Amino acid sequence: MTVELLKAIVESETSVPPSAQRIVYNNQLLGDDARTLEQVGIGEGDMLGVHVTLRSPQAPTRTAGGPSAPAAQQNLQRRQAMNPDPETIRLHILGDPRVREAVRRQNPELADAASDAQRFRDVFLNQQRREAQLEAEKEARIAMLNADPFNPENQRQIEEIIRQNAVTENLHNAMEHHPESFGRVTMLYIPVEVNGHKLNAFVDSGAQVTIMSPECATACNIMRLVDQRYGGIAKGVGTANILGRVHSAQIKIGSMFLPCSFTVMEGKHIDLLLGLDMLRRHQACIDLRRGALVIQDQAVPFLGEADIPKHLQDGFEDEPLVKGADGAEVGARTGAVTHQAQGPGGASSSTAPPSRPAPAQSSRWPQDSIAKITELGFTREEAMRALDAANGDLDGAIGFLI
């Protein structure tokens, strides 16, 4: 017996059409009607659940002379009519670990509520209401601007809307085609020894001089060699106090013992920073292909992310965040995206002035994958965008849309 035949039997007993039935077995949604019960692992005596999805009825059309409903209410009704049932989404999240992890990354609030059906429904509907309200506000703003398009102030606002749309589209394209650019890049550290004291040095070709913290200079027993005549104030993004300069000390890099000078400066969270003076003096090469600092044909591998002490990365853990498009939070210093409320493949509300409708798009992904997503209540365009963002992975695309 196939799942399709089982739905027909349920229809004969309950008068519920197969299109409204969601068969659930072991918290997993049976989406392929062509599979047999044996193929999905259902045996005699097993209990199945049937979840019935009911669509919200459309609001009656008002007469031309009567008052119209608020735009936010209309948007909410449209979303309720086209969006999937919250319980269906919840069961799909619980039944697939990959989808659950994708939702946890993109919508933590919704993922945390997945274990409670009522709480999940409340969170889901609240998010839908917020999105409908924002969309209504955008539509009202566009209508106001289009009412007087020749007003110079309106022209500036329309130009800003177009610019913001271009920025959002650029962000979505980058996240779809170059997602690696939004990851956090590990800084370049190498293990060194200064006067017999082992430490990790930060390689920075953008620094003019090699810098050491006072605590590190004390640990290396070279604080007594600091020439205070070279003290002063360093000015850049902020200010830092320069205590002085150690003109020459021995540093071990790999198996080489090299002379090096250090500028002792306060206010740095890094013990030792190898600057351009040291790198040029010894003709060092930062070889990113090999992942090593090459000096005199000897390659010293950079430390991996797991090998870098946590206190050296604390400055980036608490970095300020900048609000991006669609709720993205971007690190102000590293540029890493730490939270994305809505995936790049999800539906986004357009704020541009209305234009002619685009022709129907063809997709390079299987029609079966598109059909499975549209069965959950999403449109074909949303399904294609989500599949593009997930590189064809069905579960990942559903995770983007939820």
Curated annotation (Swiss-Prot):
GO biological process: protein transport; proteolysis
Pfam families with a match to the protein in the record: Asp_protease, Ddi2_HDD, UBA, ubiquitin
Keywords carried by this UniProt record: Aspartyl protease, Cytoplasm, Hydrolase, Protease, Protein transport, Transport
Biased composition (Low complexity): 347-363
Main location: cytoplasm
InterPro entries, sorted: DDI1_N, Peptidase_aspartic_DDI1-type, Peptidase_aspartic_dom_sf, UBA, UBA-like_sf, Ubiquitin-like_dom, Ubiquitin-like_domsf
One Gene Ontology cellular component annotation held by this UniProt entry: cytoplasm
Disulfide bonds listed in the record: none
Annotated region described as Disordered, given as residue ranges: 338-369
Documented EC number(s): 3.4.23.-
One GO MF term attached to the UniProt entry: aspartic-type endopeptidase activity
Active-site residues annotated for this sequence: D204
Annotated UBA domain residues: 364-402
Top-level taxon in the UniProt lineage: Eukaryota
Cell compartment(s), UniProt: Cytoplasm
Residue ranges constituting the Ubiquitin-like domain according to the UniProt record: 1-57
The protein's assembly and partners: Binds ubiquitin and polyubiquitinated proteins.
Similarity comment: Belongs to the DDI1 family.
Function in brief: Probable aspartic protease. May be involved in the regulation of exocytosis. Acts as a linker between the 19S proteasome and polyubiquitinated proteins via UBA domain interactions with ubiquitin for their subsequent degradation. Required for S-phase checkpoint control.
Name of the protein: DNA damage-inducible protein 1
Gene coding for it: ddi1
